[in-house]
Amino acid sequence: MKTRITELLNIDYPIFQGGMAWVADGDLAGAVSKAGGLGIIGGGNAPKEVVKANIDKIKSLTDKPFGVNIMLLSPFVEDIVDLVIEEEVKVVTTGAGNPSKYMERFHEAGITVIPVVPSVALAKRMEKIGADAVIAEGMEAGGHIGKLTTMTLVRQVAAAVSIPVIAAGGIADGEGAAAGFMLGAEAVQVGTRFVVAKESNAHPNYKAKILKARDIDTTISAQHFGHAVRAIKNQLTRDFEKAEKDAFKQENPDLEIFEQMGAGALAKAVVHGDVDGGSVMAGQIAGLVSKEETAEEILKDLYYGAAKKIQEEASRWAGVVRND
């Protein structure tokens, strides 16, 4: 099956692995790209040396295309932009900011630019400044989120722009991927399920929290004060909840406390395994993720599962024709 995304990026499967900070390193992204998807390194707030090491790792594993996710509010953003150009990275996804400042340089270097968008307005703006595609990510996703669900966002973005759309947020199996394609997406991005891939270096405690999660086990923190984040409930999310309640009672709340509480929280969970005091970012679909598999097994399950579901539904609807 071919889409504009598989053709544009020269990948076998129309499936992206989300560029999750601290999780999406060279081992994971390399395994995904090697297996035919698009592996994406999570740049996060990492310095140039760390991202370079991950790029080197991928290149040692495969010669297939891969991407780097650049957080545009990172203090090292200029260095990372220079790096991806120097290293001839084929794809850049962006978040937390406007990539227009770098668009010309990216395109001159032959880099495909795919921003993550939480709204139709931002998708249109990205198309206008020259984005090659957009990732429409719904609030079901883990980590930093917007306000629209995947079903409402993807369909409206696909109807509003002419560039390809990648659906993200709440997708972890073939049925979910099929839904994304039916909404008009030409690829899907998956995060939470890849966190527990066998090639993922996320701490075993972090993986265990996802594997044990139920459908109701994630919550949103700091949605009224700061940047909303979805994570699995733990002591940190309860502390955030209390801080928000206290802030509502104050005429001029100190919002700095939310930045302090969140600083280093993801690394604490992913790297050090503190899944009570750290931030266990995961999507609402975590309740459907029940086992560790290789990146290749995950890709094939998503791809062939989507094909099976679409074919089943097509056969059900065969012969239905509007005659009026």
Regions from the language model: what does each represent?
Residues 20, 170-171:
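Active-site metal-binding loops of divalent metal-dependent hydrolases
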Residues 116, 169-170:
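Conserved acidic functional residues
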Residues 151-162, 166, 172-324:
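Conserved active-site-proximal phosphate/metal-binding subdomains
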Residues 1-160, 164:
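Active-site entrance/lid segments in N-terminal catalytic domains of soluble metabolic enzymes
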